[in-house]
């Protein structure tokens, strides 16, 4: 006795593919007196760390947060603070407490987004001018 097998083709709906996560770029700049091309600052004088977060096509990222940290080379540092990104930028006040080279780092993140984290850093040399802010 022969057994006949029947095949039924059932169309299957594919799950939609998640959008590929983009990786923004993050650059850090410092403003304040006398930060300039030499990247010098005075101990105890206020500066502002500015993170610029953009997509590869130059579009500013409009959501997420940036965490800023500061440390001296070879020494653990501290979190300066976490601030929201608005129109591609996040900024926070920073005051060097001691003389020396300070590494200011920033990490962009957004848990509710399809964007990957991004990071960057810059180095500032703080000089002790006995409280004089130039």
Q: At which residue positions do the language-model features occur?
A:
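Solvent-exposed beta-strand/loop surfaces, strongest in extracytoplasmic domains of secreted
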Residues: 1-134
């Amino acid at each position: 006795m022969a057994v006949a097998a029947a095949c039924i083709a059932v169309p299957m709906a594919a799950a939609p593919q998640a959008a590929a996560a983009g990786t923004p770029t993050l650059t850090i700049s410092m403003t304040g007196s006398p930060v300039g091309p030499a990247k010098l600052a005075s101990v105890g004088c206020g500066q502002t760390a500015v993170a610029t977060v953009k997509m590869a096509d130059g579009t500013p990222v409009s959501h997420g947060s940036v965490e800023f940290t500061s440390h001296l080379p070879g020494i653990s540092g501290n979190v300066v603070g976490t601030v929201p990104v608005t129109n591609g930028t996040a900024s926070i006040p920073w005051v060097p407490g001691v003389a020396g080279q300070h590494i200011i780092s920033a990490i962009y993140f957004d848990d509710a987004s399809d964007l990957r984290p991004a990071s960057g850093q810059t180095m500032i040399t703080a000089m002790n001018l006995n409280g004089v802010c130039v």
